[in-house]
Amino acid sequence: MNFFAMQKSSLLPDTPYTVQSLQIVDYFIRIVYTVRYAPNILLHYQLFCITKKFIFAWQVPPPLLSYQSCSTDKQYKYSCRSTRKHSSSLTA
């Protein structure tokens, strides 16, 4: 299933939080939660993002305390899909 995803997290010690946005077909979901009390919805999913020039594949680590973006970068448009298959099955 194709989707666009954006995730960013705070490194502030007093208020750790994560913001995740997913756009699946015509549906939009925005989730804001603290990393202490909620699971990471992208955990254990391999994300494959194809830009105009590059192919990125990474495993989302728990807890994610960095900024990762698909679809919010105006310079590139990302097409992302969540899959558990090996990256060799993805073609550009």
Swiss-Prot record:
Protein role: Acts as a transactivator of AC102 and HE65 genes. Therefore, participates in the global recruitment of G-actin to the host nucleus.
Organism: Autographa californica nuclear polyhedrosis virus
Gene field: AC152
Entry keyword set: Transcription, Transcription regulation
Protein name according to UniProt: Protein AC152
